């Protein structure tokens, strides 16, 4: 605005100068015309003319020619000056227009920058809101997953607890059955030995009975021969004893037969119990195997379901890709052509759309599974296009940055000019303050001069009054009074004028102070606004520089990714499948697993196809199941049987290891402590000493009791029990004393 006002003033001054020159020339031409118009013409001879008149006419003609020459020269000078001024005005108008255009461009640039800043801020806000919403959704999903995880963990813990409880019950039952089987086996051995011994006795008794029968028959025969024998008392006694012996033997045989029958019944019961124990053992092992494989089977089933879903999704993706690959390429090319044919005025919209396309493309590339070189090529093309868009954006940002730098330089120049004006204004204020101080000093000096003059006047008046009282008369006295009054009036007027001047000085000082305060406030406001504008421009510059750096980094990353993709493409093109050989085990676990999965997948696909065919047939009268279902179930059963076999094998190995370790533990305890431990049912422990293995101690941990058959062998058993167990509560010391006593007894023997 200041430039416009200065130019207008300059043009008005130039127009005034031209109008003045025009008026002078017009007046001069009018005077010349009037001089020529009056009387006869100078070129015609008057009829009654004289030579004087001719000479005067020649002089006048010369003067006229000189004046015409001057007029022509003035007109030429005027036209030259006019042309120069027109050139200057044209140059100034061009400069003025250029400055106005630059100002308008700067204003448009600033408006564009502010608008772009607002748009970017809005985009930032929207992105922040989107990110916040996405984060909230992710947090909600994470919380839901955590809750489900916790629920699953709780279910797993409950199932584990149930499984552990069942396992403990089953193991307890197994141990109980084992102990019963061992006890029944020992009883069987004892009964078998008894039966063998009794059978041998029965055979001996049968032989004796046979011999006695022979003797009886011989006796009867002799009795029949000797119908009237004479028995002696000795023979009679022998016969009676023999009869008693026979009766005793018969009773004994009957008792043995009854005992044999009872033992046979008991043996049958024991066999039945053994059969039941073996059956329960088998059932227990089956249950344990099923329980151990249940979690594994569940996890395998879930994994297979997930794999099936993934494979189905991959199949659908491949089908979609095969169908819509050409359409996507055509759409991408059309979008590129449309983006290239747009005008420069729609740059912001292009940037927004390109940013949205970049985001969508990035999301698409993240979601895609890169398992194919075609997908890699497609991603490479997309990244190449994104790189071109980013380079265009980078160029635009560089231009904006350069414009901002120019604006910043102009603002800095204006700021320096304002600072110079501010310094000049402050210097003027300082000078005015100095003048004010000098005026105040002059005022104080004038007041002191007035005071001194009054004192001198008072002294003069007193001296005059004294002289007048002594010398002069009343008339002279009256005249002196008039003089004194005149002097007093002059002093009062001087005093009033000085007071008026002081008041005016005060007013001027107040005005100056108020003006200085107003100017300072305006200056501060201007300074604040200018500083704020400068800060805003500097902040915006810094932000744009940071954005430029981030964009350049992204560009470098994109270029590196492009290079890597190009290298991968070159490698893929150079590779030949025949030359690739992967060394693997023929019968490795991974290959087995892959083979099983492949077979299972084939069976499931076949089953799915058969079931779909059955559904398409729609025969409600006939209910049939395809053979593929049976094949898949049979395959699963075989897999389960293999896993059960493996788990049984592992369980038997672990059992063997446990038995070996338990025997080692018992041997170590026996060798170190001198006691052999035997764990029984109901938390009982049977302790055998190495110095007397036929004697033992039974410790009941539930009832906290101790029973033994060593009280007869060790003297003062009750005293030792009272001393070490009841009074001191030291069972190891009690056992140590028992070992010492037994060792002493052994050494004594």
Curated annotation (Swiss-Prot):
UniProt PTM comment: Becomes hyperphosphorylated when wild-type cells are arrested in mitosis. Phosphorylated by MPS1.
Gene Ontology cellular-component terms listed: kinetochore; mitotic spindle; nuclear envelope; nucleus
UniProt-annotated location(s): Nucleus
Spans through the membrane: none
Residue span of region Disordered: 39-59, 323-370
Family affiliation: Belongs to the MAD1 family.
PANTHER family: MITOTIC SPINDLE ASSEMBLY CHECKPOINT PROTEIN MAD1, MITOTIC SPINDLE ASSEMBLY CHECKPOINT PROTEIN MAD1 MITOTIC ARREST DEFICIENT-LIKE PROTEIN 1
Function of the protein: Central component of the spindle assembly checkpoint. Thought to recruit MAD2 to unattached kinetochores. During checkpoint activity, MAD2 is relayed from the MAD1-MAD2 complex to the mitotic checkpoint complex (MCC). The formation of a MAD1-BUB1-BUB3 complex seems to be required for the spindle checkpoint mechanism.
Stated name of the protein: Spindle assembly checkpoint component MAD1
Organism, as annotated: Saccharomyces cerevisiae (strain ATCC 204508 / S288c)
């Amino acid at each position: 605005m200041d430039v416009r006002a200065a130019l207008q003033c300059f043009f008005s001054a130039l127009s005034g100068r031209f109008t003045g020159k025009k008026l002078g020339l017009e007046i001069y031409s009018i005077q010349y015309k009037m001089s020529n118009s009056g009387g006869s013409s100078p070129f015609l001879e008057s009829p009654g003319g004289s030579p004087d008149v001719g000479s005067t006419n020649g002089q006048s003609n010369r003067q006229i020619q000189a004046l015409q020459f001057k007029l022509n020269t003035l007109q030429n000078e005027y036209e030259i000056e006019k042309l120069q001024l027109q050139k200057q005005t044209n140059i100034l108008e061009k400069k003025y227009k250029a400055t106005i255009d630059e100002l308008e461009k700067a204003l448009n640039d600033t408006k564009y920058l502010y608008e772009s800043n607002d748009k970017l801020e809005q985009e930032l806000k929207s992105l922040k809101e989107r990110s916040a919403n996405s984060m909230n959704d992710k947090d909600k999903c994470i919380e839901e997953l955590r809750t489900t995880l916790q629920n699953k963990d709780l279910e797993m813990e409950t199932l584990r607890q149930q499984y552990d409880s069942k396992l403990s019950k089953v193991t307890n039952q197994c141990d109980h059955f084992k102990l019963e089987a061992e006890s029944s086996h020992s009883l069987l051995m004892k009964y078998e030995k008894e039966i063998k011994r009794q059978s041998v006795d029965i055979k001996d008794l049968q032989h004796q009975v046979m011999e006695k029968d022979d003797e009886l028959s011989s006796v009867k025969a002799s009795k029949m021969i000797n119908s009237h024998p004479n028995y002696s008392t000795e023979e009679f006694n022998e016969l009676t004893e023999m009869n008693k012996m026979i009766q005793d033997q018969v009773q004994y045989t009957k008792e043995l037969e009854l005992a044999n029958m009872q033992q046979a019944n008991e043996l049958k019961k024991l066999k039945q119990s053994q059969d039941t124990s073996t059956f329960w053992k088998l059932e227990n092992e089956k249950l344990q195997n099923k329980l151990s494989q249940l979690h594994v089977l569940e996890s395998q089933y879930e994994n297979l379901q997930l794999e099936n879903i993934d494979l189905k999704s991959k199949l659908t993706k491949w089908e979609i890709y095969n169908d819509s690959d050409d359409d996507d390429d055509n759409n991408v090319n059309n979008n590129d052509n449309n983006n290239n044919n747009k005008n420069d005025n729609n740059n912001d919209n292009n940037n927004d759309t390109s940013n949205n396309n970049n985001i969508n493309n990035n999301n698409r590339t993240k979601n895609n599974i890169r398992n194919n070189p075609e997908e890699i090529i497609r991603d490479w093309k997309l990244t190449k296009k994104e790189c071109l868009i980013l380079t265009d954006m980078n160029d635009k940002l560089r231009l904006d940055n350069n414009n901002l730098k120019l604006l910043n330089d102009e603002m800095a120049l204006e700021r320096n000019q304002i600072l110079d004006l501010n310094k000049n204004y402050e210097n003027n204020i300082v000078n005015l303050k100095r003048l004010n101080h000098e005026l105040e000093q002059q005022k104080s000096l004038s007041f002191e001069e007035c005071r001194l003059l009054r004192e001198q006047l008072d002294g003069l008046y007193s001296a005059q009054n004294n002289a007048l009282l002594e010398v002069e008369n009343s008339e002279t006295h009256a005249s002196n009074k008039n003089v004194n009054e005149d002097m007093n009036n002059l002093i009062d007027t001087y005093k009033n004028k000085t007071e008026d001047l002081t008041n005016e000085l005060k007013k001027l000082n107040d005005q100056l102070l108020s003006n200085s305060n107003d100017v300072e406030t305006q200056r501060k406001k201007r300074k604040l606004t200018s500083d704020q504008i400068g800060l805003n421009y500097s902040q915006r510059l810094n932000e744009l520089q940071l954005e430029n750096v981030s964009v350049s980094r992204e560009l470098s990353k994109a270029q590196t990714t492009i290079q890597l993709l190009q290298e991968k493409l070159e490698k893929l093109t150079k590779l030949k499948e025949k030359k690739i050989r992967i060394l693997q085990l023929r019968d490795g676990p991974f290959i087995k697993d892959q083979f099983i999965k492949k077979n299972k997948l084939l069976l499931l696909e076949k089953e799915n196809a058969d079931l779909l065919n059955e559904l398409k047939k729609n025969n409600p009268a006939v209910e049939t199941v395809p053979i593929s279902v049976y094949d898949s179930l049979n395959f699963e059963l075989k897999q389960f049987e293999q896993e059960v076999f493996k788990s049984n094998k592992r369980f038997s190995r672990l059992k063997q290891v446990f038995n070996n370790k338990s025997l080692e533990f018992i041997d170590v305890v026996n060798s170190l402590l001198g006691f052999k431990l035997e764990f029984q049912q109901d938390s009982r422990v049977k302790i055998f000493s190495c110095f007397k293995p036929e004697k033992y101690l039974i410790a009941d941990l539930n009832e906290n009791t101790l029973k033994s058959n060593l009280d007869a062998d060790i003297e003062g058993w009750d005293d030792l029990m009272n001393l070490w167990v009841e009074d001191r509560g030291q069972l190891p010391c009690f056992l140590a004393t028992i070992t010492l006593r037994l060792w002493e007894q052994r050494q004594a023997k």
